[in-house]
Amino acid sequence: MKRGDALKILEELKNSPNMIKHELAVGFTMAALYDYFKDKNPPPPDGGFGGPEMTKEDWEITGIMHDADYEITGKSLELHTEETTKKLKEIGASQQIIDAVRGHCDKAPRNSLMAKAVYACDELTGLIVACALVQPEKKLSSVTVESVQKKFKDHSFAKGANRDQIKTCEDQLNISLEEFIALTLKTMQTHASELGL
């Protein structure tokens, strides 16, 4: 499965422009996390990167696919990922990608680093977008790590962003919250034009 296949599935499942931007943000962040782990910790022999054959593109595809059917299933958590799973199976996606996509909404165990990563960065990208939208310019370039940290502590801000889920970066990914925010923000700023921010 290639990145282009993932983007085609988003079209087939009638994703809105804003949802596509969210999925791309998570995809870009997943690719950055792959590089982070490759640099910091070579993959363990048991395939902790999602499987011994998982590539950077696979990590990005997992990020792009994680919410592919969220709108078409009426935002129902019970139905979420079911349509995506069908599409991924039809196209011959790896079981590791399918499990990671399903795992982000508790429909499969998050046993791999890839599954744990998409679970943590899903909510953080949303929080960072919310931080950008309250800036006068509504641009990611105006957002700082410090401003995200401040908003993270303010539970009345972006209430839908699950802080506990974001904080799994610490015990599941062994990345401090500050470093996780910094990596995600930098990645999103690098791709700001593609994210419309």
Regions found by a protein language model. Name each.
Residues 1-42, 50-76:
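Acidic/His-rich, divalent-metal-binding segments that scaffold phosphate/diphosphate chemistry
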Residues 4, 20-24, 78, 142, ...:
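Electropositive phosphate-/nucleotide-binding environments in soluble metabolic enzymes
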Residues 10, 34-37, 84, 88, ...:
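Hydrophobic alpha-helix position signal
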